[in-house]
From Swiss-Prot:
It comes from Bos taurus. The gene is MX1. CDD domains: DLP_1. This is Interferon-induced GTP-binding protein Mx1. Residues 355-522 are annotated as: Middle domain. Interferon-induced dynamin-like GTPase with antiviral activity against rabies virus (RABV), vesicular stomatitis virus (VSV) and murine pneumonia virus (MPV). Isoform 1 but not isoform 2 shows antiviral activity against vesicular stomatitis virus (VSV).
Amino acid sequence: MVHSDLGIEELDSPESSLNGSEDMESKSNLYSQYEEKVRPCIDLIDSLRSLGVEQDLALPAIAVIGDQSSGKSSVLEALSGVALPRGSGIVTRCPLVLRLKKLGNEDEWKGKVSFLDKEIEIPDASQVEKEISEAQIAIAGEGTGISHELISLEVSSPHVPDLTLIDLPGITRVAVGNQPPDIEYQIKSLIRKYILRQETINLVVVPANVDIATTEALRMAQEVDPQGDRTIGILTKPDLVDKGTEDKVVDVVRNLVFHLKKGYMIVKCRGQQDIKHRMSLDKALQRERIFFEDHAHFRDLLEEGKATIPCLAERLTSELIMHICKTLPLLENQIKETHQRITEELQKYGKDIPEEESEKMFCLIEKIDTFNKEIISTIEGEEFVEQYDSRLFTKVRAEFSKWSAVVEKNFEKGYEAIRKEIKQFENRYRGRELPGFVNYKTFETIIKKQVRVLEEPAVDMLHTVTDIIRNTFTDVSGKHFNEFFNLHRTAKSKIEDIRLEQENEAEKSIRLHFQMEQLVYCQDQVYRRALQQVREKEAEEEKNKKSNHYFQSQVSEPSTDEIFQHLTAYQQEVSTRISGHIPLIIQFFVLRTYGEQLKKSMLQLLQDKDQYDWLLKERTDTRDKRKFLKERLERLTRARQRLAKFPG
């Protein structure tokens, strides 16, 4: 586990200790403590950044921003001890990760620049500016365009602090020369990409001789960090401050003007004349200290530890270490969660398609077998569904319930409606029979009519259920074969062909059933039992009536009551028969047989080996996505391994 409490806050940097009067042994012991506590933290984050983890998660960092000509490059030069590209216009054209590593006094200077998968050793500090310029040209091309591609500069020296900074292009407001018209927008978008992250400390460089409230860099930092919790202000060019305004500068540094929770520092770096006269960076540091010691207004800031490059280096190292220690537990958890999410997402894309023909066959078998198993589970009502979805059988059963209601509604007409219909048939079709004799033709005609009107609703239900099943099977195909467009297309074609075939068979069977229902038939014992129940029910209702005068006046012919009882008894039986048998037909043809035929048809694809390559051809975006996810997963796996080994 990574722990946030590493005891860093109470540890002085070796930079500050070397300015004291301790003997060499004390210096050595302090440096060892510093190496033990500080270096592992920074090295860990640098190693994660070198892995590319920043493509997946934000890492603790210090981003350096400033308006053009704010002195940003001079500050970085003073901290790193190397010259960086200079000139007019846009000089920093790519984000520059400046990794500073403090070495022991006996060690020699080392440098290395990395970009676009290239790594170039730099033998001498004087070559840094040239290598950075060439790297920017390689990435962003000739001219003044910018790029989001990182350049990493690693400087190892006894004279630099342990620190990692990200230098961003200076903010420009107006495109000049051959700069893109939207150069201001491009630069600000690049800067926001970094300073928006809560894991980033924003180091805002502002000239001391300008109104701090008008600087674009500080305004951008305030937009993303309104409380100033992770912003440090750096004032430069104190030697250019107008006489009489020094106290205002002191007030700014003391956080009395534009409040930042982390406050301000002030430094004096090499000016243009100093560079022209080739003043060394060491000499510039000496001159800087003398400037603050001798300045009537600024010497107090030096005593308060708020002035000079060495104080800034110590402060930034301390801030970065505390920031790293604070964010490491969260970072570890984020990496773990992201690793799990990417692993799950990668599983959806399956394995890479094998090259060997025999392996391709097994790959296709596996995919078809998985598809077939889900189809069978689906038709048996055992498939897995998401929380708010329903199983196929549940959807089909709902349609069957609607069908049952349609049948029931068709037969359940009120007394008056049925009696009226019976009376009409009596008046139209009664033959030689005396009153009180039941006309079987009347009974049969009414039954046939009521059954016949259910045929088309039954066929409509068949089409509805078939569409539901076809759509479900297509969804299963998409789930398993969507990344293989030929295999998915073939499966959909088979799903449609078998649907038409089975739907036609089911419709024939349904229409045949309704033709058979035109033969009025019921088992004698079943019919007698149903008729007896109807008569008993009517007798009970008659018994419960207080007066049957109204009823008798409505039923003038005994045959009407008799036919009504027979109709009701037969309706009950035919209703049960139709309600159950039509769903059985549909289940048999367009659910079970449909699924089984589809399974067999998919297995037949394995017989044509010449089609394997065609069937297993992936979408280009699928292949690229799998590769992208595998790269991310590898990065995160290595990041977790490094975090696990961190001695926190």
